[in-house]
Amino acid sequence: MILIIYRALFFVTIPGVNSAALAKLSNNSSLTMLSMFSGGGFENFSIMSLGVTAYITAQIIVQLLQADVIPTFTQWSKEGQTGRKKLDQVTRSLTLVLGLVQATGITLGINTLTNGKFMIENNPFTIIVIAVSMTAGSFIAMWLGDLITENGLGNGISVIITAGILVRFPSMINDVIKGVTFGTKVNWIRFSELMIGAAILILLIVWFTRSELRIPIQYARRAQLTGKDSYLPLKIIVPGVIPVIFASTIMTIPQTILMFFNAGQNSSWYRVVQTFFTLSTTSGVIIYGLMIIFFEYLYSIVQIEPDKFADNLEKQEAYIPNVYPGDPTKEFIQNMLNYLSLPGSLFLMLVSIIPLLVANSVSSSLQIGLSGSSILIITGVLIEIGRQIKGLKLKREYGTFLSTDFSLDD
């Protein structure tokens, strides 16, 4: 129901814009990237055009600042639910600022690219109306994402991004068909090869996403009572698809900033930024891949938190065999995360950048190039939803079992 509401809002267009002028920028790489996170909101310039990009950017900044950059944020991160609420409030406030800046930059940039034909009336009031409308839509998307997280299945923001990608999938398939069409005939053999390749890719993603390293955990009291041990399952890709989502978001920021300076397109700094922060160039794709690796390592630590894990084990009188409690346990978990992050990050990077490199050499469609990242996000999110459904099912069955009345009477 929440996704239906989210999708319905795409038909609420922003007043004061010329849709015909916008349609001429359909192949713009920056808008294509942004559309991946909003489900095509830029096609009719709806209030949902920004999607959740501003919120994701704010999350990245706040989480990075927690790493002993701002002591107050670091302290809040250790205060449990109370501290989390404070950090969430900071994230929302930062989302407001980033949303307004991003919306203003996109509006001015599109207006420049269309030679002033994008806005029906070129005045500050129109810019303010458009920017506020886009920012309001971003907050609505953020709120709906939080509702999904609290009451639905999976991470709400990831689910919203996945829904947006799925909406654009028919268009992506159409681009693929155009790419294998010669004259008026479709090369179905080539098309079949691409579909088989996509199927193999999905299988690899499923295997990597579900693979895990099990670290044995022993509880002194439990071992005496039951003789059974527990284990900590560490996935090969610990943070899931978050590195791909965050790297994709970061790549849109420089392009948005450049929209403020379209008049300086001939300057050297403009060309450098445009070259290194766009997915239509080899250098930009390489930077995108390096960002995926960086976020894989970073969010493996953020998600597991070796410090807290070691402290919790000690409080529960549990330990990892052959590893001393305290700092040695922390270092052991840290080493395991680094060990797993190497194959995990390389896999995420290769799946994301190979289609981009191929598309840049044989096709002008960035949508095809983003197919690897899109399939990765969709598959990862659906696997996580499936895992949660399985957990809820087991919980319900367990509850039914406990509520059943048993009698020892004949």
Curated annotation (Swiss-Prot):
**Per UniProt, what is one Pfam family of this protein?**
SecY
Location in the cell reads: Cell membrane
Q: Which InterPro entries match?
A: SecY, SecY/SEC61-alpha, SecY_CS, SecY_dom_sf
Q: Which PROSITE patterns match?
A: SECY_2
Q: Where are the transmembrane segments?
A: 2-22, 45-65, 94-114, 125-145, 147-167, 188-208, 241-261, 284-304, 339-359, 366-386
Could you tell me what this protein does? The central subunit of the protein translocation channel SecYEG. Consists of two halves formed by TMs 1-5 and 6-10. These two domains form a lateral gate at the front which open onto the bilayer between TMs 2 and 7, and are clamped together by SecE at the back. The channel is closed by both a pore ring composed of hydrophobic SecY resides and a short helix (helix 2A) on the extracellular side of the membrane which forms a plug. The plug probably moves laterally to allow the channel to open. The ring and the pore may move independently.
* Quaternary structure note: Component of the Sec protein translocase complex. Heterotrimer consisting of SecY, SecE and SecG subunits. The heterotrimers can form oligomers, although 1 heterotrimer is thought to be able to translocate proteins. Interacts with the ribosome. Interacts with SecDF, and other proteins may be involved. Interacts with SecA.
Which family is this protein grouped under? Belongs to the SecY/SEC61-alpha family.
* UniProt-recorded name of the protein: Protein translocase subunit SecY 2
Which species? Lactobacillus kefiranofaciens subsp. kefiranofaciens
